[in-house]
């Protein structure tokens, strides 16, 4: 892979990003690597000066390590002697130039994006499971749990961001294409659009699942409207759109989709019986629960419009994942599979055995009730999880172990307090990626918003100890919910990923000790 300085200049001019350029010798200079991390720079590299924490010393280090050109929003004396491309927006420039450097791998992939406050990961895994039936296992995945870029073990690895930085994204796409992948399913976060990580990408299918206040704070979105605006950009940049008609702010969501997509290519779905008098458009697909228990979920999907009838996906589906809320996630994914050319038979077969690390994983016990590990990490997902458990159990005592991350998602904390007050009998407030904040302060902030006449609380910062205490006190008819971390095998503490056994591993160890 390589890119010439001349090509960079032409691309930046085409998108009206180039403010000025300083070419040292010839525009035909070839760069053989690209990087935004000075520690990873190789000889003949193009270096991007980006990020709120960028320091000129990083450019000095990049130059010493072999960078011959840099892209930045202002010139730096540290770059003297290097080719300089000064741009209006370095994040957008990095996305465009990275795509070109990796020879536009998106053009060789059927590209699918999911956005929403909750359900992105589950929906993405459901769709991958089905598409693998279509293409023989050649579906790449970029999610907040795992990235899967090929069939070999080394092609599957833990993700660090829901949506990678643009340079990493296009590198991953190129790797997927070179590995024979034909489809890519990815979660698209609001930050991906706010920080231009997916700038220039057009998706074959774009999904909008739901929206509720989240990711609002100093380091994220200044307010809900900014959060919503960034979420909506996926629909603006998709050829076909699939929308949950039950979402809040539906009128805004649908309007965003129609700015670039013909209504004939916009598909709506909702639960059977859902009616919204303000909904001016017909719902295309309906789904209805058949049977939900603590082993599997069954539901039916029916077509309800002329364009929906063209997709042969109606029928009964079985999920190995519990939770009636997963019917919503599955329905959207099935519609996507139908639009990708799949039939009911292949969809039903592909989705039936999908499981997701850290999503609705259960541990059954003899004397300590049901233990559930789930990534539920905001008010909406917490409420959905606890309410499902109360419907499934006659008179359960719901015990929750949960914390809130530091340095981000500050707006989630009141939501935790409200959901625990509404549905939990007892909550163990504990550590969950505190970052540079004090975990005790985070827990006390959540605790201050809880009505203790409805929900008893204990603050135990040692997450492993909190899990052990919660399980130990649970009776045979109780439910213990371990929320927020899912399958994470680390705690983010003061900039370091500190090893952590994982909620499901700890839960199994505790039960083994208690019931041996």
From Swiss-Prot:
Positions of post-translational N6-carboxylysine modification: 231
Modified how: Carboxylation is probably crucial for Mg(2+) binding and, consequently, for the gamma-phosphate positioning of ATP.
Subcellular compartments: Cytoplasm
This protein's GO CC annotations: cytoplasm
Predominant place of localization: cytoplasm
UniProt pathway: Cell wall biogenesis; peptidoglycan biosynthesis
Spans through the membrane: none
Keyword set, alphabetical order: ATP-binding, Cell cycle, Cell division, Cell shape, Cell wall biogenesis/degradation, Cytoplasm, Ligase, Nucleotide-binding, Peptidoglycan synthesis
Binding residues annotated for UDP-N-acetyl-alpha-D-muramoyl-L-alanyl-D-glutamate, in chain numbering: 38, 162-163, 189, 197
Pfam families according to UniProt: Mur_ligase_C, Mur_ligase_M
Binding site for ATP: 116-122
Gene Ontology process terms (BP): cell division; cell wall organization; peptidoglycan biosynthetic process; regulation of cell shape
Keyword Hydrolase in record: no
UniProt-listed InterPro entries: Mur-like_cat_sf (IPR036565), Mur_ligase_C (IPR004101), Mur_ligase_C_dom_sf (IPR036615), Mur_ligase_cen (IPR013221), MurE/MurF_N (IPR035911), UDP-N-AcMur-Glu-dNH2Pim_ligase (IPR005761)
EC numbers for this chain: 6.3.2.-
Record has Lipid biosynthesis as a keyword: no
Gene Ontology terms for molecular function: acid-amino acid ligase activity; ATP binding; magnesium ion binding
Family stated for the protein in its record: Belongs to the MurCDEF family. MurE subfamily.
HAMAP family: MurE
Function field: Catalyzes the addition of an amino acid to the nucleotide precursor UDP-N-acetylmuramoyl-L-alanyl-D-glutamate (UMAG) in the biosynthesis of bacterial cell-wall peptidoglycan.
Protein name, entry field: UDP-N-acetylmuramyl-tripeptide synthetase
Organism for this UniProt entry: Lactobacillus delbrueckii subsp. bulgaricus (strain ATCC 11842 / DSM 20081 / BCRC 10696 / JCM 1002 / NBRC 13953 / NCIMB 11778 / NCTC 12712 / WDCM 00102 / Lb 14)
């Amino acid at each position: 892979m390589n890119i010439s300085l001349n090509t960079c200049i032409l691309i930046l001019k085409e998108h009206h990003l180039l403010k000025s350029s300083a070419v040292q010798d010839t525009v035909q200079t070839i760069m053989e690597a690209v990087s935004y991390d000075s520690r990873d720079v190789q000889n003949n590299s193009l270096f991007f000066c980006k990020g709120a924490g960028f320091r000129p010393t990083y450019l000095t280090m990049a130059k010493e390590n072999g960078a011959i050109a840099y892209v930045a929003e202002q010139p730096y004396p540290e770059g003297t002697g290097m080719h300089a491309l000064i741009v209006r927006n370095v994040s957008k420039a990095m996305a465009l130039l990275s795509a070109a450097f990796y020879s536009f791998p998106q053009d060789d992939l059927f590209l699918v994006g999911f956005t929403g406050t909750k359900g992105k990961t589950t929906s993405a895994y459901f769709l991958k499971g089905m598409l693998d039936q279509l293409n023989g296992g050649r579906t790449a995945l970029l999610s907040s749990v795992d990235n899967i870029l090929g069939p070999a073990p080394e092609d599957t690895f833990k993700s660090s961001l829901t949506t990678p930085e643009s340079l990493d994204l296009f590198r991953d796409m190129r790797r997927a294409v070179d590995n024979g992948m034909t489809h890519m399913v990815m979660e698209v976060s609001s930050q991906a659009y706010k920080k231009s990580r997916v700038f220039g990408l057009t998706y074959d299918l774009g999904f909008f699942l739901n929206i509720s206040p989240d990711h609002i704070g100093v380091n994220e979105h200044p307010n809900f409207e900014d959060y919503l605006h960034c979420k909506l950009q996926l629909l603006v940049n998709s050829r076909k759109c699939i929308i949950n008609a039950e979402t809040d702010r539906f009128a805004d969501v649908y309007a965003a989709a129609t700015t670039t997509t013909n209504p004939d290519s916009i598909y709506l779905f909702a639960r059977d019986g859902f009616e919204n008098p303000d909904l001016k458009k017909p719902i295309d697909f309906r789904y209805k629960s058949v049977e939900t228990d603590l082993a599997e979920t069954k539901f039916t999907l029916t077509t309800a419009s002329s364009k929906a009838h063209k997709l042969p996906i109606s029928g009964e589906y079985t999920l190995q994942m519990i939770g009636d809320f997963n019917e919503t996630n599955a329905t959207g994914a099935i519609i996507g599979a139908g639009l990708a050319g799949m039939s009911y038979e292949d969809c039903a077969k592909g989705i039936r055995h999908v499981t997701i690390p850290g999503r609705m994983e259960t541990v059954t016990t003899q004397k300590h009730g049901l233990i559930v590990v789930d990534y539920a990490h905001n008010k909406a997902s917490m409420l959905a999880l606890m309410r499902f458990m109360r419907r499934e159990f006659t008179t359960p005592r719901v015990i929750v172990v949960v914390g809130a991350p530091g340095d981000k998602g500050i707006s989630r904390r009141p939501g935790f307090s409200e959901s625990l007050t509404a549905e939990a009998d007892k909550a163990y407030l504990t550590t969950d990626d505190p970052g540079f904040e004090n975990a005790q302060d985070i827990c006390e902030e959540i605790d201050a918003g809880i009505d203790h006449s409805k929900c008893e609380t204990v603050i135990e910062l040692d997450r492993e100890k909190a899990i052990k205490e919660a399980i130990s006190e649970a009776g045979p008819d109780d439910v213990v919910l371990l929320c927020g971390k899912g399958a994470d095998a680390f705690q983010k503490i003061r900039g370091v990923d500190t090893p952590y056994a994982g909620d499901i591993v700890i839960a199994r160890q505790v039960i083994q000790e208690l019931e041996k």
